Amino acid sequence: MKKLYLKTHGCQMNEYDSAKMADVLKFSHGLELTEDPAVADVFLLNTCSVREKAQTKVFSELGRWRPFKEKRPHVVIGVGGCVASQEGETILKQAPFVDIVFGPQTLHRLPDLLDSVIQKRKSVVDITFPEIEKFDRLPQPRAEGPSAFVSIMEGCSKYCTFCVVPYTRGEEISRPFDDVIAEVASLCEQGVREITLLGQNVNDYCGLMHDGQVADLALLIHYLAAMDNIERIRFTTSHPSAFSENLIDAYAEEPKLANHLHLPVQSGSDRILAAMKRNYTVLEYKSKIRKLRAVRPDISLSSDFIIGFPGETDADFEATMNLIHDMGFDHSFSFIYSPRPGTPAAQLPDDVPMAVKKERLAILQNRINVKAAEISQSMVGTQQRILVTGPSKKYPDQLSGRTENNRVVNFNGDTPLIGQMVTIKIKEARPYSLWGEIC
């Protein structure tokens, strides 16, 4: 059996895409995943262009793969994802040993691309945007455990000034409503109990229904919650400007919708938000959270922050810190700003010194870490309903799962509990997890 070595950079959407790459090549060519590159026949790198030095990271990885191809010339190396979409033929110029370059929207064509390389021994590039075609040509989803990702839309049409996603993944396109329902139903039959709905801007979902009507994210959640085997529903990533009243109503009406929301705000300064073209103000963001907490008072809130965006002053940063205090975020993905090629913000002077960026990032992360520790400590003594996902990564003799507010809980238990919802009494708050006992 031939082997596939697959490495993924970036977000949950990329993780989902990588799983589909493995599925489609297993179905078409019988390729089995391996964690040992020395025995691999096909190498795939699924890339992310959001963070700093993304291209450098890609070519460094490819450099580590080159000796495998020199030693075994039949090896096929492919580069996919957002860097592939952004760089295209440039990848072949800088790394001529690469055989396949494909974008996020053409991963379903991997079997044909692989056949072309094998037959012609010539590199191929396909970074087109064939809309929603890829979902129609993928194999049936395979569950890897009781929790699964389901992509419900692709691309983004917000065009924030710092972001490359609209240029690398294309405009927003929603999957048909019935297709999403069918995929979730198939996963349920395989034992999945928790679904995470994915999209670059997931709450802009507008799925065409069989009767010609259009379903928004809230309606999709209502339908999924009606499935008996679904115990919990999550979604990511949301955009504040598209966070609707219907979605707030769904939190009020559907107990299966997890008591956690990731809603990236990026900055607490209206001036910086305008420069980012985020299309909301701090007051509007706060208003949506206030309405949400009126129906879910104890909901856990996480966010994204970009530190040191061009023109960010001490006052702008202080406004961000004030927002963090007011909102009580207990987790964040926070990054130092770096210009992404081809974005409007890349034309702005990157005028915040790196030392200042690093200092601000450390201050922000410390504030959020303190809040997260406080919340974790407050959970000691409470009973939490968790979905048991498998053995603990850190403590293999224990089982592990996640609370509704997305905290890892480790506990002693037997393997038949995997895939079940259990109630755990939290006994201890640890730095990156909780520990408890079955009630």
Curated annotation (Swiss-Prot):
Its EC number is 2.8.4.3. Belongs to the methylthiotransferase family. MiaB subfamily. It is found in: Cytoplasm. InterPro entries: Elp3/MiaA/NifB-like_rSAM (IPR006638), Methylthiotransferase (IPR005839), Methylthiotransferase_CS (IPR020612), Methylthiotransferase_N (IPR013848), Methylthiotransferase_N_sf (IPR038135), MiaB_methiolase (IPR006463), rSAM (IPR007197), rSAM_horseshoe (IPR023404). Catalyzes the methylthiolation of N6-(dimethylallyl)adenosine (i(6)A), leading to the formation of 2-methylthio-N6-(dimethylallyl)adenosine (ms(2)i(6)A) at position 37 in tRNAs that read codons beginning with uridine. Monomer. Residues 142-374 form the Radical SAM core domain. [4Fe-4S] cluster 1 binds at C11, C48, C82. NCBIfam families: miaB-methiolase, MiaB/RimO family radical SAM methylthiotransferase. SMART domains: Elp3. It catalyses: N(6)-dimethylallyladenosine(37) in tRNA + (sulfur carrier)-SH + AH2 + 2 S-adenosyl-L-methionine = 2-methylsulfanyl-N(6)-dimethylallyladenosine(37) in tRNA + (sulfur carrier)-H + 5'-deoxyadenosine + L-methionine + A + S-adenosyl-L-homocysteine + 2 H(+). Keywords: 4Fe-4S, Cytoplasm, Iron, Iron-sulfur, Metal-binding, S-adenosyl-L-methionine, Transferase, tRNA processing. Binds 2 [4Fe-4S] clusters. One cluster is coordinated with 3 cysteines and an exchangeable S-adenosyl-L-methionine. Residues 2-119 form the MTTase N-terminal domain. [4Fe-4S] cluster 2 binds at C156, C160, C163. This is tRNA-2-methylthio-N(6)-dimethylallyladenosine synthase. GO terms for cellular component: cytosol. It comes from Coxiella burnetii (strain Dugway 5J108-111).
